[in-house]
Amino acid sequence: MLRRGGSASTLRRSRTSNLLLHSFPYRWDVTECAGAREKILIYGLGRSGRGVARFLAREGVRAEWHDAHPTAEDEALMQELGFLRGDPGGTYRTVVAAPGVPIDHADLLALSAGGAEIIGEVTLAARLRPHLPLVGVTGTAGKGGTTVLIAHLLRAQGLSALEGGNIDPPLLDVVDQAEVAVVELSSFQLERVPGLRLPVAVITNLGVDHLDRHRTVEAYHAAKLNITAGQEAEDVLVVPAGLEVRTRAQLRPFQPERLSLADGRELLPVADLPEGIHPANAAAAVLAAEALLTRLGRPVEPERLAAGLRSARPVAGRFETVARIGNVRFIEDSIATRTLAVEAALTRAVPPIAWLVGGRDKGADLVPLRAAAQGRVRRVIAFGEDGEKLARALGLPFETVPGTDGDTVMQAATRAGLEALGGPGGAGTVLLAPIGTSFDLFRDYKARGASFTRAARALVAGEVRA
């Protein structure tokens, strides 16, 4: 099995702590891996898998790879790193699987039966960098914004903190550049974190998502709660006030209407937050940053934390105003495919709203969205594979934009949204909070968001007739 060795080259201690934060019942020895006594397979070459490959190459560890549909970019990178294509039917000691590969995938089950240990990038990072403090963030909605904000607040306190994980960049791309890594953790990643102990963990909320993968809400929540499974009494778990969680860690409940430290001292009024910073994310981030500073023996300076909140900026592609025409605002929230995230977008957008809905339906709960849309949404603009189905289920006035070319469809949908609000002389919000995933028309949610942004800015510039 992978072993955690004791050489100075292997254990790069963070300047923040001499504590070994992760307790694993196995060891990782890079020299053993480099000596080819450890056979490793990287299963899946998405963003995470490529990060794993680059990391292992930097460590001098040879590995093989497998991907059912590798891109030309994937194959070029593997060739550059000197990694050979592996056989998923072969025998390996360790398989580092991409988050998108289900834990019950036939190949992974066969590899496990053959003696392989199946892990993910987070476990790999924790084993090879056991002295690097990791702050883990999960939740149904808000985890990306909270992750970025925690890292920002820690930097405001003078720490070299970087974010990674489910959010760009991959965690393994930042572990050697930071004193602290703040990690966004999806439910997929949290299925593969045996033995992970986080000094500080955050659960932003628990809703319903990814039932196509987890099958039940209970299984989805169980995966999320793995974030605290390895925590001990001196660790901290930040949760929304009222959320009941079984944990050995100290609970730090946050309330979105109050930006305060654990002792109740308020840092600044919620009204003073910059545009686009969600109060709940900010409240959770403050408590998480404070907890880590305390755990590391660093002073907590309220003035610097408050300054960090004031200087925070929203994450691109998360409820971002990308264009304006008069009193019409175009807001890009392409990542809003979870009920909680879409509901938050509908609540925050200035009405009347022209709501762009579409993509591939993944079974989101529409009941809360009907309530959030009442009196706020003027018209739904349906697009993509399941846009019309979603619009009909919402029971709101809608029109459908046909087509199979992503950019062309997005241009037409954005223009239709503007017209629904009365054209350039109207008022309100054209909101892309699509409910459906992007894979029907686009490579990913970022590509969909970028297409919407281009279309909106083209309308502003007069390049597309409104």
Curated annotation (Swiss-Prot):
This is UDP-N-acetylmuramoylalanine--D-glutamate ligase. GO terms for molecular function: ATP binding; UDP-N-acetylmuramoylalanine-D-glutamate ligase activity. ATP binds at residues 139-145. It catalyses: UDP-N-acetyl-alpha-D-muramoyl-L-alanine + D-glutamate + ATP = UDP-N-acetyl-alpha-D-muramoyl-L-alanyl-D-glutamate + ADP + phosphate + H(+). The gene is murD. The keyword Cytoplasm applies. The keyword Ligase applies. It comes from Deinococcus geothermalis (strain DSM 11300 / CIP 105573 / AG-3a). Pathway: Cell wall biogenesis; peptidoglycan biosynthesis. GO terms for cellular component: cytoplasm. Its EC number is 6.3.2.9. It is found in: Cytoplasm. It comes from the Bacteria. InterPro entries: Mur-like_cat_sf, Mur_ligase_C_dom_sf, Mur_ligase_cen, MurD. Cell wall formation. Catalyzes the addition of glutamate to the nucleotide precursor UDP-N-acetylmuramoyl-L-alanine (UMA). Belongs to the MurCDEF family.
